[in-house]
């Protein structure tokens, strides 16, 4: 969404960069007040689509669906399960992190983090959106490198081709439900089938 300064979004809990992140963020917030740059100035339908795309490429939490929809509605934008589903069908899962993959978020950070992931997504992301630091998303991810291509997969060799999260509808979920197929245990696939025999 553009609220955090570049390079800090997935900083591990024990990393010494937290003090630097707090200092730089505090300074930037004060500058934003002087510039009259409000969080609402950073939000748009495009920024929410970028956020959804990023969550899907991470095979992020199904809770992110609820949170992003709530934030969008609160800010006056339209985001619903149908839009999540449409975006999910075209976004590959590039982050080989748990529970869908084998690495930890700490490994993801040291492999290049969110900047590298967003850069790897290429044209699936609209780089024209503005960030809290006043630069565009494209400017912020320009030059980002992937340091471990098994943790952050290239777009041509994703962990999963698409559907990091899927939206389910039907008589059991008339208003919709969300599932994360890449994290499901394939040996228990039978739990999701209905037998008509």
Each language-model region and where it sits:
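Catalytic or ion-coupling anion/metal-binding cores of large enzyme and transporter domains
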Residues: 1-197
């Amino acid at each position: 969404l553009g609220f955090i300064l570049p390079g800090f979004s997935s900083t591990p809990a024990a990393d010494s960069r937290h003090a630097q992140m707090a200092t730089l963020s505090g300074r930037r917030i004060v500058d934003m007040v002087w510039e009259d740059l409000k969080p609402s100035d950073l939000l748009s339908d495009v920024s929410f689509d970028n956020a959804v795309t990023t969550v899907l490429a991470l095979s992020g939490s199904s809770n992110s669906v609820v949170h992003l929809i709530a934030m969008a509605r609160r800010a006056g934008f339209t985001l619903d399960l149908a839009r999540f589903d449409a975006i999910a069908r075209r976004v590959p899962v590039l982050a080989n992190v748990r529970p869908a993959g084998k690495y930890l978020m700490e490994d993801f950070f040291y492999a290049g983090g969110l900047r590298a992931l967003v850069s790897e997504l290429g044209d699936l992301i609209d780089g024209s959106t503005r960030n809290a630091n006043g630069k565009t998303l494209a400017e912020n991810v320009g030059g980002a490198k992937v340091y471990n291509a098994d943790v952050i997969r290239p777009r041509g060799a994703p962990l999963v081709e698409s559907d990091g999260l899927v939206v389910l509808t039907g008589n059991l979920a008339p208003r919709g439900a969300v599932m994360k197929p890449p994290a499901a245990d394939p040996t228990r696939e039978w739990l999701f089938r209905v037998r008509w025999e």
